[in-house]
């Protein structure tokens, strides 16, 4: 593993001196060409040629053939095919992968390129490795060592240098357009770069027969989350067709025949095959009764399999490991966890659409249990804080090994996913929905108590690190995370959704303190913060195209190559690096205030995501306002598909450069169960404001 470059050169010289019938530089040039190639298919072709070189002895020929076969599989097999050889072994076994190439072989530096990538993506993908400082450091250091050997042997290999921290610019920066607001120019370029990355995946990875992208169904199904600004915000036929192809294929697999996974797994993995396919299907095909009925069916599983009455007479999940037919019996898995709401996202959307009373009563009975547990101070949990888990069957707010905030003991499988605050805004969104559907104030109690604790923390920042599990610790972790596009922490996202839907000013003080990346404000300071966040995001998106595309080996981590370059091993905020803010783009263009896994979009712009920018500034149930800028030189025809306005009559108005412009038809009629479409013409290169409000 630690063969020096000098030893490799000595071995190369030995091969060259033994060459018969070829010029001495022929073998050398082939090895150099293979090592310096930045395209793996090109490398495969060169190795195929090298393998037929008549001067190679049997040993070197076998090594070349073995390496060529590995590279072929890298190009043509599943993205993590190499895991099969290390399955059942310690995580570090990936570092000893047998390429069939000796340590002193001149081909060894090429193997180091693949060893480094396997180590890097294992670190990026594996949460148990990533959150263990000792293991994370070993993986990072070993990967870097491999890439350094590659860079030393093959200085033209830009892929290895990218992993070592060299930023590789890609694409072009659009020319400035006079009159375009800064936010619009920044957003436009990011939308177009995101679309280019998505189209790369469709063109180069999507399989014609199944729609898969090579990372396995369980990882591929999560890709739509970072597609959301383009996929859900606009209308790109190629991208929409690709998503529909994948999701329709995914939900017809045998293990989902009954409507949910037939094999028991933890909820994050058991639910993703339904949630991460049904939700985009329900959004993209809203008139399909098939998907709505399937969403309603989640309520049947909840009633018949997943939940029961605990010893307090309350409804709760009996475990966070379950399938379509049973829950896990193990005591260490007998917890109702925050993330269990992930299995119910399709049901929540179906309830919101249909108002089904039976399903609503069931969901509310479960949420009542969480409201009650939040109010209690129990097992060290502060009153007013949602617990990480509720133990079955006694209904206590409790976790593993006496820690209320840890349903999984440290070092256990998926520990970092389930530890508090986990995906807390997914359950606070469910509480918000329950309030808007029923009008009951009780569902706001957890939001109010945690908002007060978060506000108290911001006003009185502790001088020392808070004790885990304490109120101060909770107040700190309720912060939205700048660099992690997830629902971990970030209570503010739910509060922003609630404000948008109801117009309440109750949480304004807290919302104002959390920053415009998460709460879009239209005042001067808010716009400056928003533009600063967009600049950071664009800086990350302008470099390292391979890190978003060809280098990715875990399709649920397409936006996370930068994680490998972080300066420490915590990865909470990716110290020293910035991740593209794809959720910010989604919030800007759709008017939603949170992540798309439980989408609450105000609008879809029925036009391609090119030469355009959109900023929704108001998106309540009765009013809508958006700023738009079209960068093209000719007027643009499009429609706004309005998704959040409650039934009624509305009037639309358009202003261009502050002056009213007459619409061909300014009437908007919203009927129950249907989305209205407003067609209009967007003028070229002028700031336009679209406003929709109730008819007097």
Predicted segments — roles?
Residues 10-19:
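Bacterial N-terminal signal peptides
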Residues 26-633:
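Catalytic domains of carbohydrate-active enzymes that cleave complex glycans
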Residues 659-666:
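Surface-exposed loop/edge segments in extracytoplasmic proteins
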Residues 667-696:
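C-terminal beta-strand-rich structural cap/linker in extracellular carbohydrate-active enzymes
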Residues 651-653:
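Beta-strand signatures of extracellular beta-sandwich domains
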Residues 21-23:
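Boundary at the C-terminal end of the N-terminal hydrophobic targeting segment
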Residues 1-6:
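N-terminal secretory signal peptides that target proteins for export/translocation
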Residues 631-648:
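Surface-exposed beta-strand/loop patches in extracellular or lumenal glycoproteins
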């Amino acid at each position: 593993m630690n063969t020096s470059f000098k030893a490799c050169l000595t071995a190369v010289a030995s091969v060259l001196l033994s060459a018969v019938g070829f010029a001495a530089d022929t073998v050398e040039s082939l090895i150099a060409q293979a090592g310096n190639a930045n395209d793996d298919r090109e490398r495969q072709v060169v190795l195929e040629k090298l393998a037929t070189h008549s001067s190679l002895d049997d040993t070197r020929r076998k090594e070349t053939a073995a390496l060529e076969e590995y590279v072929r599989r890298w190009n043509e097999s599943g993205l993590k095919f190499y895991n099969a050889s290390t399955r059942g072994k310690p995580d570090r076994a990936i570092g000893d992968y047998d390429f069939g190439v000796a340590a002193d072989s001149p081909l060894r530096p090429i193997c180091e390129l693949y060893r480094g990538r396997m180590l890097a993506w294992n670190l990026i993908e594996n949460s148990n490795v990533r959150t263990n400082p000792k293991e994370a450091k070993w993986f990072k250091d070993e990967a870097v060592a491999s890439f350094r050997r590659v860079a030393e042997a093959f200085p033209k290999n830009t892929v290895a240098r990218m992993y070592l921290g060299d930023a590789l610019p890609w694409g072009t920066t659009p020319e400035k357009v006079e009159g375009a607001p800064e936010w619009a120019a920044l957003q436009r370029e990011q939308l177009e770069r995101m679309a280019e990355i998505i189209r790369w995946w469709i063109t180069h990875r999507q399989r014609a027969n199944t729609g898969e992208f090579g990372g396995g169904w369980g990882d591929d199904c999560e890709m739509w989350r970072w597609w959301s600004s383009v996929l859900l915000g606009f209308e790109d036929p190629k991208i929409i067709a690709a998503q529909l192809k994948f999701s329709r294929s995914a939900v017809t697999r045998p293990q989902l025949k009954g409507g949910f996974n037939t094999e028991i797994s933890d909820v994050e993995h058991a639910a993703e095959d339904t949630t991460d396919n049904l939700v985009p299907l329900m959004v993209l095909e809203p008139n399909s009764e098939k998907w709505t009925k399937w969403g309603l069916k989640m309520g049947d599983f909840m009633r018949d399999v997943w939940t029961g009455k605990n010893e307090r007479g309350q409804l709760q999940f009996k475990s966070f490991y379950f399938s379509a037919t049973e829950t896990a019996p193990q005591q260490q898995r007998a917890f109702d966890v925050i993330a269990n709401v992930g299995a119910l996202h399709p049901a929540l959307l179906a309830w919101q659409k249909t108002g089904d009373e039976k399903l609503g009563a069931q969901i509310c009975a479960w949420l009542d249990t969480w409201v009650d547990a939040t109010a209690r101070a129990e097992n060290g949990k502060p009153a007013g804080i949602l617990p990480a888990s509720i133990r079955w069957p006694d209904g206590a707010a409790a976790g593993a090994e006496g820690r209320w905030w840890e349903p999984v003991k440290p070092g256990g499988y998926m520990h970092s996913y389930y530890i508090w605050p986990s995906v807390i805004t997914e359950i606070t969104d469910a509480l918000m929905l329950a309030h808007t559907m029923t009008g009951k104030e009780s569902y706001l109690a957890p939001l109010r108590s945690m908002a007060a604790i978060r506000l108290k923390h911001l006003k009185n920042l502790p001088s020392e690190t808070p004790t885990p599990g304490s109120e101060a610790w909770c107040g700190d972790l309720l912060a939205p995370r700048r660099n992690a596009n997830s629902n971990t922490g970030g209570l503010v996202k739910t509060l922003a959704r609630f404000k948008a839907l109801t117009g309440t000013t109750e949480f304004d003080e807290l919302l104002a303190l959390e920053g415009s990346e998460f709460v879009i404000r239209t005042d001067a300071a808010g716009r400056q913060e928003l533009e600063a966040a967009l600049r950071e995001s664009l800086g990350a998106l302008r470099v390292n195209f391979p890190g978003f595309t060809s280098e990715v080996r875990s399709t649920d981590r397409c936006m996370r190559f930068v994680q490998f370059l972080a300066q420490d091993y915590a990865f909470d905020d990716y110290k020293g690096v910035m991740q593209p803010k794809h959720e910010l783009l989604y919030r800007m263009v759709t008017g939603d205030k949170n992540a798309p896994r439980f989408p609450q979009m105000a609008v879809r712009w029925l036009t391609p995501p090119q030469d355009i920018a959109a900023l929704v500034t108001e998106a309540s149930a009765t009013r809508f306002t958006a700023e738009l800028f079209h960068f093209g030189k000719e007027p643009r025809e499009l429609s706004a598909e309005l998704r959040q306005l409650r039934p009624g009559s509305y009037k639309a108005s358009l202003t261009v450069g502050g002056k009213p412009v007459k619409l061909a038809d300014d009437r908007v009629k919203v009927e129950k169960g249907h989305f209205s479409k407003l067609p209009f013409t967007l003028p070229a290169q002028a700031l336009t404001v679209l406003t929709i409000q109730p008819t007097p």
